[in-house]
Amino acid sequence: MTFSVDKVRADFPVLSREVNGLPLAYLDSAASAQKPSQVIDAEAEFYRHGYAAVHRGIHTLSAQATEKMENVRKRASLFINARSAEELVFVRGTTEGINLVANSWGNSNVRAGDNIIISQMEHHANIVPWQMLCARVGAELRVIPLNPDGTLQLETLPTLFDEKTRLLAITHVSNVLGTENPLAEMITLAHQHGAKVLVDGAQAVMHHPVDVQALDCDFYVFSGHKLYGPTGIGILYVKEALLQEMPPWEGGGSMIATVSLSEGTTWTKAPWRFEAGTPNTGGIIGLGAALEYVSALGLNNIAEYEQNLMHYALSQLAAVPDLTLYGPPDRLGVIAFNLGKHHAYDVGSFLDNYGIAVRTGHHCAMPLMAYYNVPAMCRASLAMYNTHEEVDRLVTGLQRIHRLLG
């Protein structure tokens, strides 16, 4: 299938709107991607004609809704090449998935004197849950430091592991720098030391294929809303043997086998024992539509188009005076920058006046900001629906801001 950005853009209604009298150039998909009509329509159709509470219902609507939900679990397992659909837990998003692991697996396996390894480029969602776990049990949090070019100091990694290392929690792709970490060698090293590996895939799954079996990671987590799906839904993959050993972290309906006031409660099997309460069934249906949409386009086709667009953007941005770019030349999805000494919020506000949407702030990565000694950065993110013309508008906008502000 030949990739056509014009055909893709036609599927996204919001891309036809104007902002401040100018065509919208949406360069903020790393925060949250826009939704194609196929996703919007699938979720709307479910609520119009197919909605019912899932699980245990004997009536037709409930049975059909349950089947649709479980079919999405199967589709998601194929999307990341899991061995079984029962290795996938529906979660609200990447943040909840990481917290689930920290509170279930972590509480059961991390003890006083143990340690967990993260990196300096992590999103707060892959820092704070581990800080909280370490504080609860008396464990140590160790950090892989950054290089100035936005890559990790991988030569330090072997020195961080020891017999007390229980987990390496690492991002697949940095949400600020676009750095893609060499997971294969990092996971191999972790397993050689008897540690498990959790991968934050929030910024990876929309850019190229992910194969969790080939990676051999123990946990992999991502969100639907960055993958052109709805908010409030995500996927946590856990190797089956691990998942079956993990206790539930939330109690309620749907995750029990039996409940007795005198004899206590027993749990249903995984993954359902991690899905307490009424699920976000509409969001799950929308996620399924997003996975189907992206798969039909072909992730390899998307990757090729986006990489060409990224190379073009980096080459054009080199012509902007006083522009500081952060991150390595080979990157995925995002371009973080500052313009002279101007605050990122000011630059972002000017760009918004030109109809260009970028993200400004610390991007939930304060330790990374501290490393670069800046309070904030602007971040333009490139998705499969962005164009060379939108990159040109960004470059022109930054040149105009430089002339205005000096």
From Swiss-Prot:
Family listed: Belongs to the class-V pyridoxal-phosphate-dependent aminotransferase family. Csd subfamily.
Transmembrane segments annotated in the record for this chain: none
Positions annotated as active site in the UniProt record: 364
Annotated metabolic or biological route of this protein: Cofactor biosynthesis; iron-sulfur cluster biosynthesis
Needed co-factor(s): pyridoxal 5'-phosphate
Domain of life, per lineage: Bacteria
Modified positions (N6-(pyridoxal phosphate)lysine) in chain numbering: 226
Chain's gene name: sufS
InterPro entries noted in UniProt: Aminotrans_V_dom (IPR000192), Aminotrans_V_PyrdxlP_BS (IPR020578), Cys_dSase_SufS (IPR010970), PyrdxlP-dep_Trfase (IPR015424), PyrdxlP-dep_Trfase_major (IPR015421), PyrdxlP-dep_Trfase_small (IPR015422)
GO process annotations (BP): cysteine metabolic process
Organism lineage string: Bacteria, Pseudomonadati, Pseudomonadota, Gammaproteobacteria, Enterobacterales
EC number per UniProt: 2.8.1.7, 4.4.1.16
SUPFAM superfamilies from the UniProt entry: PLP-dependent transferases
Quaternary organization: Homodimer. Interacts with SufE and the SufBCD complex composed of SufB, SufC and SufD. The interaction with SufE is required to mediate the direct transfer of the sulfur atom from the S-sulfanylcysteine.
Reaction equation(s) it catalyzes: (sulfur carrier)-H + L-cysteine = (sulfur carrier)-SH + L-alanine; L-selenocysteine + AH2 = hydrogenselenide + L-alanine + A + H(+)
Subcellular location per the Swiss-Prot or TrEMBL entry: Cytoplasm
Protein name according to UniProt: Cysteine desulfurase
Purpose: Cysteine desulfurases mobilize the sulfur from L-cysteine to yield L-alanine, an essential step in sulfur metabolism for biosynthesis of a variety of sulfur-containing biomolecules. Component of the suf operon, which is activated and required under specific conditions such as oxidative stress and iron limitation. Acts as a potent selenocysteine lyase in vitro, that mobilizes selenium from L-selenocysteine. Selenocysteine lyase activity is however unsure in vivo.
A single MF term (Gene Ontology): selenocysteine lyase activity
Name of one Pfam family that matches: Aminotran_5
NCBIfam families membership: PRK09295.1 (NF006791), sufS (TIGR01979)
Listed GO CC annotations: cytoplasm
Keywords carried by this UniProt record: Cytoplasm, Lyase, Pyridoxal phosphate, Transferase
